């Protein structure tokens, strides 16, 4: 609780000096095996805030269940309340600041994305550009995939879910071998 309260205090102070005119690209952050993972992820996203202004999200995992919170606006406006951070339970978290380069500026396109697969749940946050996302998406749709977002990140999630591999890590590797472009990923 001390760390969470300290984090909220820092965010409120930093928000006063934030310049919303700076806009670049998305930012991703991940942390594992630590108490107050949601608060530390919010703080990490805040440090990346200059890179994305449209929205932000955090997915956490408590060893059994995933929790997700995604909102339009700045990190300091959305993750500065103890109640919000307490709802994001778990010692593992990933987060994303959104500045759309592909996909529409809608709530459903705010990452991280979470999906249940036949190997279990997975959370994905992506930064960068997939140069073959349109062709991959078209192929997945031809094969029966249903997309909920217009973000190229969902293509990664769909590739993981579609993989014939058994273990989650093998599904991820299978998906990564199909992706082209420059990007970073954090997964949970």
Locate the predicted segments by residue:
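Conserved short alpha-helical segments that host acidic/polar catalytic motifs at enzyme active sites
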Residues: 3-188
């Amino acid at each position: 609780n001390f760390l969470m309260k300290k984090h909220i205090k820092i965010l409120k102070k930093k928000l006063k000096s934030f310049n919303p005119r700076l806009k670049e690209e998305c930012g991703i952050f991940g942390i594992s095996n630590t108490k107050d993972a949601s608060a530390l992820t919010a703080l990490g996203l805040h440090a990346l805030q200059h890179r994305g202004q449209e929205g932000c999200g955090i997915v956490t995992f408590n060893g059994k269940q995933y929790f997700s919170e995604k909102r339009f606006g700045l990190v300091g406006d959305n993750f500065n309340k103890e109640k919000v951070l307490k709802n994001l339970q778990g010692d593992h978290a990933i987060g994303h600041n959104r500045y759309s380069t592909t996909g529409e500026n809608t709530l459903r396109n705010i990452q991280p994305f979470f999906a249940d697969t036949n190997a279990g749940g997975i959370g994905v946050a992506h930064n960068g550009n997939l140069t073959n996302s349109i062709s991959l998406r078209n192929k997945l749709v031809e094969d029966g995939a249903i997309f909920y977002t217009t973000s190229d990140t969902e293509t990664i999630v769909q590739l993981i879910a579609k993989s014939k591999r058994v273990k989650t890590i093998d599904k991820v590797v299978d998906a990564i071998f199909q992706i082209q472009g420059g990007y970073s990923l954090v997964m949970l």
